[in-house]
UniProtKB/Swiss-Prot annotation:
It holds the Pfam family FliMN_C. It is found in: Cell inner membrane; Bacterial flagellum basal body. This is Flagellar motor switch protein FliN. Its main location: membrane. Belongs to the FliN/MopA/SpaO family. Keywords: Bacterial flagellum, Cell inner membrane, Cell membrane, Chemotaxis, Flagellar rotation, Membrane. PANTHER family: FLAGELLAR MOTOR SWITCH PROTEIN FLIN, PTHR43484. GO terms for cellular component: bacterial-type flagellum basal body; plasma membrane. The keyword Protein transport does not apply.
């Protein structure tokens, strides 16, 4: 069976520029790059020499042939926080912003009362009012699952403020680390 292909519309294929300012800026940037490339004003990388040479490997740290700014680069502190427009970002600020985004992601938590195994014929013969026996007894802890992984165990309770609803009281939180 052939797959159904969705036609690409002009609106989906092109980025939308709400006003002409963004489009003019993008075109201007592209022209600048093309002009620089056409003039050949990009820095040379220097002569790499003979790679097949049997000469002894040089241990000098003169990297000026690789764009000229390498000496400054070699002395940079890699542990320093990144700078944007002259302002230093506090260490770990990106991590905390990402954590805030992650903490806002909704997840489904499943409470597993028990399981049952039956033949297809038994499943097909189920009718309204039938009782399915589970593999757990009354009072045994239930499993709390997230994404198919057991994260805790708990006891079924009735909510204090709403006696028409059930809840789960955690009795054991399992390690989240993979072995």
């Amino acid at each position: 069976m052939a797959t159904k292909k969705t036609p690409v519309t002009d609106d989906a294929a092109l980025p939308s520029f709400e006003d002409g300012v963004d489009l003019d800026q993008a075109i201007g940037d592209l022209r600048g790059v093309l002009k620089t490339d056409a003039e050949g004003s990009l820095s040379d990388f220097g002569d790499f020499g003979d790679f097949g040479s049997t000469d002894e490997v040089s241990t000098d740290n003169d990297l000026s042939a690789f764009g000229g700014g390498a000496a400054d680069f070699a002395m940079d502190d890699f542990a320093a926080a990144p700078q944007v427009a002259g302002v230093k970002a506090p260490l770990g600020s990106g991590l905390s912003e990402n954590m805030e985004m992650i903490m806002d992601i909704p997840i489904d938590v499943q409470i597993v009362l028990g399981t049952s195994r039956m033949l297809v014929s038994g499943l097909m013969s189920l009718e309204e009012g039938a009782t399915i026996a589970l593999d757990r007894k009354i009072g045994e802890p239930v499993e709390i699952m997230v994404n198919g992984r057991r994260i805790a165990r708990g006891e079924i309770t009735v909510l204090e403020d709403d006696d028409t609803r059930f809840g789960v009281k955690l009795i054991e939180v399992l390690s989240t680390r993979k072995a």
